[in-house]
């Protein structure tokens, strides 16, 4: 039974997502349905948490909007995610960046930048 679940989940898992970690600054395009209309909404922030695995994987993204911290928990396997673009790769020593919640202003989104080498094929 367990193998059957793994096979079904592997078939359903999204393959078009970039490799992301806590500390990375990302910009997401989310599909929002309002009544009969459908539009894309941009959401940019820092990943402060990553939990689950496979089809159950979720990330918590935090941004500062008009001086107020806003967090969204987003399932990565959601069909409402149009695209994810990594703006900045963050270098952290922790898996959960909950200490960013106490910070205000620019410091609330400041994480050291990680150097990423370009793939050999490009």
Swiss-Prot record:
The keyword Ribonucleoprotein applies. Gene3D superfamilies: 2.30.30.790. One of its GO terms (cellular component) is cytosolic large ribosomal subunit. One of its GO terms (biological process) is translation. Keywords: Ribonucleoprotein, Ribosomal protein. InterPro entries: Ribosomal_bL19 (IPR001857), Ribosomal_bL19_CS (IPR018257), Ribosomal_bL19_sf (IPR038657), Translation_prot_SH3-like_sf (IPR008991). GO terms for molecular function: structural constituent of ribosome. NCBIfam families: rplS_bact. Belongs to the bacterial ribosomal protein bL19 family. This protein is located at the 30S-50S ribosomal subunit interface and may play a role in the structure and function of the aminoacyl-tRNA binding site. This is Large ribosomal subunit protein bL19. It comes from Prosthecochloris aestuarii (strain DSM 271 / SK 413). The lineage of its organism: Bacteria, Pseudomonadati, Chlorobiota, Chlorobiia, Chlorobiales. The gene is rplS.
């Amino acid at each position: 039974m367990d193998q059957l679940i793994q096979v079904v989940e592997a078939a359903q898992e999204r393959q078009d997502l970039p490799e992301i970690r806590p500390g990375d600054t990302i910009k997401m395009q989310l599909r929002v349905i309002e009544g009969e209309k459908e539009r894309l909404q941009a959401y940019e922030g820092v990943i402060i948490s990553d939990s689950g695995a496979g089809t159950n994987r979720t990330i918590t993204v935090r941004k500062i909007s008009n001086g107020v911290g806003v967090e969204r928990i987003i399932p990565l396997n959601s069909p409402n995610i149009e695209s994810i673009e990594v703006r900045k790769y963050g270098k952290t020593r922790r898996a959960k960046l909950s200490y960013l919640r106490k910070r205000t202003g620019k410091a609330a989104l400041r994480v050291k930048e990680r150097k990423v080498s370009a793939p050999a094929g490009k």
